[in-house]
Amino acid sequence: MGSSEAETPAKANKASAPQEQQPPATSSTATPTVYPDWTSFQGYPPIPPHGFFPSPVVSNPQGHPYMWGPQPMMPPYGTPPYVIYPPGGIYAHPSMRPGAHPFAPYTMTSPNGNPDAAGTTITAATAGGETNGKSSEGKEKSPIKRSKGSLGSLNMITGKNCVEHGKTSGASANGTISQSGESGSESSSEGSEANSQNDSQHKESGQEQDGDVRSSQNGVSPSPSQAQLKQTLAIMQMPSSGPVPGPTTNLNIGMDYWANTASSSPALHGKVTPTAIPGAVAPTEPWMQDERELKRQKRKQSNRDSARRSRLRKQAECEELAQRAEVLKQENASLKDEVSRIRKEYDELLSKNSSLKDNVGDKQHKTDEAGLDNKLQHSGDDSQKDTN
């Protein structure tokens, strides 16, 4: 940060005059903690810290060479040595609070209710007649300029506001002050002194001009229009507008095309009336209700059709069974008639057979008797011949 002193141009004379009159005061920023026994944990020459993490105190955050040194091509045999960690961890600097740089993952709350990634508290600017933040010329937005100091110093981002007669603007987030002039930036040492003077003057004046000039977290002094954007707004749930309304349809479409129009069609029954339900939007469009009614009617019609088909199928089956029963009855009657006829014929045959048997028996008896008579006659004749 000391290299930025040589590259920044000189300040304006009008801007330096009020700075010299202000008495120095104690800075409100926290003093970084320096560990006195830091060298006892590290026996290696110090290396400049990484440029991404700026630090006002030159510290040696490097760890043990077994962690940061080059790895050998072949791992050594045996148990590797114990890795030594410096106090506070490798990446945690003792001189920086959580969220002390703009890209920190820790967010700190600011007075206006918005999370402040830089982790700093917004302070008021100089009080009294030196501050003219309410002037019309000071309402323009100031460009963000990055200081040309150290490589990773992101805390030196300062802003320039259009102020009349070389008067100072608000303090930046990291404790520096942007002043109006030719370049609009100054060195870090003079900025810290001006910050201490502004802090002491702010303590004396109180909070009378707290809302006049404020510095943002990136070092840009915002205009009143920007301050309005930082106000916390309540999140309101926007009601959904619903689907795009379409043409009104009903069940009579195509039925009364030549007789009635869509406006003269009868109203559908069973429409759902829109009710005030919290957290939901009632369907107030008529075409949505018509579509639901149409679907309901289609469902009912399909149910009726299926019931009618099943009823017709059962009726057809019953008719077929009745026809078959009639046919079977006729066949049964014809079979009964035939059986009765056959039985009559059988009876007739039995009677004829019995009559024939009787006739045959009579004739045979007569023949037997005639033959017996003949035998008797022959036997009588033979006996007479023998006696003679």
From Swiss-Prot:
Using the UniProt annotation, give all residue ranges assigned to the region (Basic motif): 295-314
Indicate whether Ribosomal protein appears among the record's keywords. no
Q: Where in the cell is it found?
A: Nucleus
Q: What induces it?
A: Induced during incompatible interaction with the fungal pathogen Puccinia striiformis. Induced by abscisic acid (ABA), ethylene, cold stress, salt stress and wounding.
**Keyword tRNA processing appears in the UniProt entry:** no
Q: Pfam families of this UniProt entry?
A: bZIP_1 (PF00170), MFMR (PF07777), MFMR_assoc (PF16596)
Alphabetized, the UniProt keywords read: DNA-binding, Nucleus, Plant defense, Stress response, Transcription, Transcription regulation
The ranges of region (Leucine-zipper) come to 321-356
Q: Which Gene3D superfamilies match?
A: 1.20.5.170
Annotated Basic and acidic residues bias: 302-316, 359-369, 375-388
Instruction: Name the residue ranges with Low complexity bias.
Output: 23-33, 180-193
Q: Where is this region: Disordered?
A: 1-46, 126-249, 261-316, 348-388
Q: What does this protein do?
A: Probable transcription factor that may be involved in responses to fungal pathogen infection and abiotic stresses.
Query: Which family, according to UniProt?
Result: Belongs to the bZIP family.
Question: Which named protein is this?
Answer: bZIP transcription factor 1-B
Taxonomic source organism: Triticum aestivum (Wheat)
